[in-house]
Amino acid sequence: MPSGTGTSACYLAKHTDLRVFTAPCVGDSDYLKKQIYELDKDSKVQILNPPKKYHFGNLYKELYEIWLEVCKSGVEFELIYDPVGFMTLFANLDKLGSEILYIHQSGILGNITQKQRYERKLKIKDHK
């Protein structure tokens, strides 16, 4: 699951027997570790690094493209955190088991304006 402060990942790991993996979307892995540690010093959350640094809220063509691809599943994902989560997931498949549960944890209302930003700034058209 993608994380800002890691709160959802921390409490999911604390209260289930699942192996919980998260990806930093707001800061780097050190920032995320610190945030999680403040909530639970014994947290078992495993942090996976994205394939490259994405600055929060900035537009990246590859993030929009992966978002379009995963939305073909019939589920609309959020356009800021989820693309970083999926890029990280796909880059780290070798570290994960054969069964993966991706937790969709965020709203999609912001997608309207985020798509407009992509269309305006990067000249990307909605292919859905």
Where are these regions (language model features)?
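PLP-dependent amino-acid enzyme catalytic core
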Residues: 1-128
